[in-house]
């Protein structure tokens, strides 16, 4: 089960990825996490990435693909994985396809989360997380059962990301539509794309996702 979750920021990809992890036992792969792990582990590609970052430059697609490739070779990915927030561009999508093909692998499905822009801005504008465990909350949609106490770990410390506001969100959407939304057509043409209604209640979205996964 090799998945890509596609959709704009705030569409609910992270929430659904976590549910897939819990139910199916496959890892969620974030490029940021993989990059940090490779650098900390001192792998060959990690050293290359560190040199680039230390110089204050952006890590190239080639290095990112190499890090993803290295991570996919780990034993916990034997039964599949979820690519979260990657690929972001058509160039990265082509490189990912080629990398998987070289391993004799193929993507199982690309799940696209469809949500209106207005709703995305509303969601992100009220979002905050537990500083301890990262559980996501929202000012109106999802507040802790006990005010000021995380449902999952009991922490009383919460934080808001500086970029979780309407102005920044609108800019992030512009980047998404310019760079990432072309992937919708790309994967549709390959017969891999499966859309879900990201406007629905979280449990309903999960049901739609599971219906897709049950057919793999």
From Swiss-Prot:
One of its GO terms (molecular function) is ATP binding. Residues 126-163 are annotated as: LID. SUPFAM superfamilies: P-loop containing nucleoside triphosphate hydrolases. Residues 30-59 are annotated as: NMP. The keyword Glycoprotein does not apply. It is found in: Cytoplasm. Disulfide bonds: none annotated. It catalyses: AMP + ATP = 2 ADP. GO terms for cellular component: cytoplasm. AMP binds at residues 31, 36, 57-59, 85-88, 92, 160, 172. Zn(2+) binds at residues 130, 133, 150, 153. ATP binds at residues 10-15, 127, 136-137, 200. Consists of three domains, a large central CORE domain and two small peripheral domains, NMPbind and LID, which undergo movements during catalysis. The LID domain closes over the site of phosphoryl transfer upon ATP binding. Assembling and dissambling the active center during each catalytic cycle provides an effective means to prevent ATP hydrolysis. Some bacteria have evolved a zinc-coordinating structure that stabilizes the LID domain. Monomer. HAMAP family: Adenylate_kinase_Adk (MF_00235). This is Adenylate kinase. The lineage of its organism: Bacteria, Pseudomonadati, Pseudomonadota, Alphaproteobacteria, Hyphomicrobiales.
């Amino acid at each position: 089960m090799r998945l890509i979750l596609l959709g704009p920021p705030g569409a609910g990809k992270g929430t659904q990825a976590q549910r897939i992890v819990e139910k199916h036992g496959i890892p969620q792969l974030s490029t940021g996490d993989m990059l940090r792990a490779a650098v900390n582990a001192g792998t060959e590609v990690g050293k290359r990435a560190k040199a680039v970052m230390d110089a204050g430059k952006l890590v190239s697609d080639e290095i990112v693909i190499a890090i993803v490739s290295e991570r996919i070779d780990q034993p916990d990915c034997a039964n599949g994985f979820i690519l979260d927030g990657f690929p972001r561009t058509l160039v990265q999508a082509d490189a990912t396809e080629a990398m998987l093909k070289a391993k004799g692998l193929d993507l199982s499905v690309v799940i696209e989360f469809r949500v209106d822009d207005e709703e995305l801005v509303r969601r992100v504008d009220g979002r905050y997380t537990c500083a301890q465990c990262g559980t996501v909350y929202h000012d109106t949609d999802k507040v802790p059962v006990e005010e000021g106490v995380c449902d999952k770990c009991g922490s009383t410390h919460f934080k808001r990301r500086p970029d979780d506001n309407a102005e920044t969100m609108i800019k992030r959407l512009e980047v998404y539509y310019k760079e990432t939304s072309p992937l919708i057509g790309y994967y549709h043409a390959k017969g891999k794309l499966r859309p879900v209604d990201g406007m629905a209640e979280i449990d309903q979205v999960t049901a739609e996702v599971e219906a897709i996964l049950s057919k793999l």
